[in-house]
Every structure is written in C-alpha cells, then in structure tokens.
Amino acid sequence: MISGRRIRLYRQRLGMTQEVLAGLADVSPSWLSQVERGVRAPDSLRCLIPVAEVLGVDPMDLIEAPRTRVREQTGTLDGVREVVSALRRDPWRVVGAEPDLQRLARQIGEAEALRRQCRYSELGPLLARLIADAETAVRAHQSTEREVAAFTWLSHTYQTAVYTLFRAGEGHSITWIAAERCAAAARRTGDPVVQALGARSRAYVLSHAGWETEAMDTIMAAIDDVAPASTAPVVEPASDPWWSPAPSALMGALFLDAAKAAARGNDRPGVSRMLREAETVAARVPEDGMLFGPANVAAYGVFAAIELGDATEAVRRGTGIDARALLPFKDRPAMLHIDVARGYAAKGSDEAALHRILEAERMAPEMTRQHAIVRELVSAMVRRRESRSATPGLRDLAARIGALG
C-alpha cells in the first residue's frame, strides 16, 4: 500500500473529506487528490508531515515497508529480521562467550564494508551476531582498562545497525532503539569524536522521523563538541577514517547532516548556511573513508534542492556530478541517482527519471528496491502511463520493487 492509499484509509476512518483534510493540512486539494489516486508521488517526507499531523499518525505510518515478496527475492528480509530480533533483546541479558576485542573490531569493520556495498542479505546475519558479541564484551570489560574500547565498538556496531535498517527499508521505531543505544554507548567512552558519531546516528533517525528541530539541535551540539579539535591541520586521511575520522572531516559531515535537516524543515537560509560551512571545510580536508569532500557536498546540494521543491535546480546540480566520485560507497551514488530521478519526475520527465532509477538499481539493487521514495515514484509513473504509451522497462522495474499493486 503506497502512501496515497494510506492517506485515504486514515482520512476515511475519520470521516473526513479530501477538501477538509487539504484545508487543515494547508495543502492543495488537487495535490492531495493526485497523491491519493497514486498519479503523483509526494515530493518528500516533509510533504507528508502536515497531513500526518491532521490524521493523528506518525509520518512513517503513511509509508509502507517494502513488500515481503520483494525482500524475499534478495534475501534481505531474513537478514533484517535477524538484526531486528537482536535489537529487541535485553542487552544485559544476552548470554555468550567473551569475545576477543581485536577480532570483534575486525568483524565490525567487515560488517561496515558490507553496509557500504549495500549487501544487506549478507550483512544481516553477521550484524545480528556482532550486536550480541559487542553487548557481551561491554559486560565482560566493565570497570577494566578495556571498558572504553568495548563501549567504542558497541557504539560503532549500533551505528552500523542504524544505517542498515533504514537503507533496508525498516521504519524508525526499531531504528530508534539502535540510535539511542549508539549514543548512550558513545557517551560512556568520553571521546568527543565517538560521541559525535553517536550523535549523527541519533540525528539521522530524528530527521527521518520528521523531527528536524531536534535533529538540528543534536547536530549543532556535536559540532560544538568537535570544533576545538577541528582546527588542527590535516596532512593525510586517518588510517581508519570511518571510525576515527579527522575532527575537521567529521565536522564537515555534520554540517551536511545539518543541511539535510534544514532542507527537511523547509529552512532555505539554513540549508545555504550549512552547505557553505561544509564547502569551507571540504576545501581543506582530503577525501577520506567517510567520503567527505566536494563531491559529497555537491550531492547533498541535490538532495536539499529537491526537498525544498526546486526540481529544476536539483536536476541542474545533479547532472553536473559524476556519481563515481562518491565511490567506494554504493548507497551514496545510488542516492544521488534517486534524488535526480525525483527532480526529473517532478518535471514530468519520466524517461529520464526511469534511467536514473535503473542506474541506482544497477549500483545498489537491494537498497533501491527497498526504497520507499523509489516505490512511490515508480508507482506514480506507472499510473500516469496507463493512458499513454508505455515507457520501456518501467513495468518490469515496477514488478521488481512491488510497485504494481
């Protein structure tokens, strides 16, 4: 069930007409009608927030998780279920042998590498086991000289879980558990960099849930924490730039997070200010494993433009970026293609939008097929094309991602 059908379902349960809902949510009645009929995809989650508030539901309740049969085709469903089950357990009641911290660190690195490649069907079972192992390690090393290391790797494990669950199509409820545990474990380390990484995870969930103000507050506090160390000159990337980034690179990434939260909150001046800050940092920081640099700043500019409703600007920015510059991560170039596709679709250029989505699928098939916005876009394109000539490949794509029904 796509968001339009869910909006209609909740609206009818309340005995509310489209005109009344549109008036209370301050949206166009024609826009609401098109979304409910499935001929137009919501431009962003931000568009659904006022509608959800009137209906008395969470914005994420208006977006269905990926269809089970689609996730079964890639094996994603079983892997994600294992991670969800691991997070539902009481972390202080997990029973297991004490893991070796060096081995645990190496395996967490392997899990993060799988996440960067969007290989969720392989990642799920490994990450579920690592959550239990990291929780066991913390209990085993309490009040010892290795306690900080144990909490550090526990925080990193939860961080990988946060991004994995969202990219694999899970809602924010279970992901919030991982984010809160990530931030709590990070605080136990006393390390400003680890704490800022934990704050990023928490802000990520807040922003996706529509709580942009809280996300921005979390991000700006983290920037303040790492700022004192960020002025040191950077000669070369850190040896482990994802888990131990240079403070200046981390601060730049936080500015990008702030730009994303500002865009979701429709704060155009805030977006411009945060992107300028990120550009300033990117000019003096080498590219690193976090992929903070000019290409990543440019990609966030595309996202911000489409979130702010400027499809033409999103396409203009996006077509000027070589997605390969965002490698070795697979999700980041794939998301660039998806954001550009959103711009093309908003302009009515379905063929160009389809091309970009197919590029995203080629690069990161599991992530693209689970992505709620992709399903919305493809479903709307299919409905628009029912009375016109079919776009080659569109219905095949719709079948693969479960956007036909």
Region annotations inferred by a language model:
Residues I7, Q18-A22, L32-E36, L62:
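Conserved hydrophobic/aromatic packing and binding residues within compact polymer-binding modules
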Residues E64-V95:
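Short, charged recognition helix plus adjacent turn
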